[in-house]
């Protein structure tokens, strides 16, 4: 299936390659580089590229491209899912999936890729099994390996490889038994000039950190599970139980993993947490304009909105901006024409604003349209969709674990048109 894998950074350098069958020349990536040059943004590179003799299937993760080379037709989503699993494994092993982390652990990377694919076909992709086959890097283990010349490859076969629950290893023991869940939601929205919502959608995930002894059987229920659309499950979830009762029933993997990802697409269920008052104007035959924006929280949120950043791509005729913020600080890059206002957190009692003059090139025509505002923010202890965990029940073990749920809402692609 997969003949080769190339890892490419944002500069276009191939810093790692792995071949499972015959060696494929790096020149095959020229087709990928051509598509990258044509794309307006790195995220817009086509995930599937057809060449005369190969198919290139790629993903973009953490400022890296994972480009796989295929010689026969296969379901593209199958390959894309595997590439994401590779990136997730690197993240789990090294703490980050970056070029530096991969180069620092290049031996372990090749060992992992050798175990994850057998002659080009996915074999072991569960983190718990891989950690039994190849020990994660530690400072002590690295020192011992350098002295003794040994490797991180385990000397015993994994216990869960042939069981019905390959995602969980046997004999797990903890002094403190804990089960924590993070409900993280990103809101994508487009707001028009009048403040009306043109488009709104919520992308959410539930990440779990499970450190439980033995073989626990968990059931996680929600207050309002019917609002979830397009739910994607970890393989441990019993799908029939979800279909009939809307309850997540599962024997969890050990450690950190993504339990589900979901989408809320009904616009009447998507609450917009912030509003923006704006007045951006450019006069005809004038070398200056006015810029005035105010941002505030919706009254019904009840939570502090923090980490607010407003980014504006100004027209090319703008030379400079002389603005005064009532809160936070701003920067304007005269080369890229990007205005960035770091607001911080806001409260209804004092609404932050940014206003002042915009200097334009003399004799230049008036900009045809006003720029859009791109907003980033974070709200702690709130799921913007209204999703709430009801309870977590455990069966099969007699101890009482520590339980916890944390909610976070973040802005995804949040745009306000002016």
Curated annotation (Swiss-Prot):
Bilayer disposition of the protein: Peripheral membrane protein
Transmembrane segments: none
Pfam families: Adap_comp_sub, Clat_adaptor_s
Domain of life: Eukaryota
SUPFAM superfamilies tied to this protein: Second domain of Mu2 adaptin subunit (ap50) of ap2 adaptor, SNARE-like
Family annotation (InterPro entries): Adaptor_comp_med_subunit, AP2_Mu_C_sf, AP_mu_sigma_su, Clathrin_mu, Clathrin_mu_CS, Longin-like_dom_sf, MHD
Record keywords: Cytoplasmic vesicle, Golgi apparatus, Host-virus interaction, Membrane, Protein transport, Transport
Protein name per the record: AP-3 complex subunit mu-1
Gene expressing this chain: AP3M1
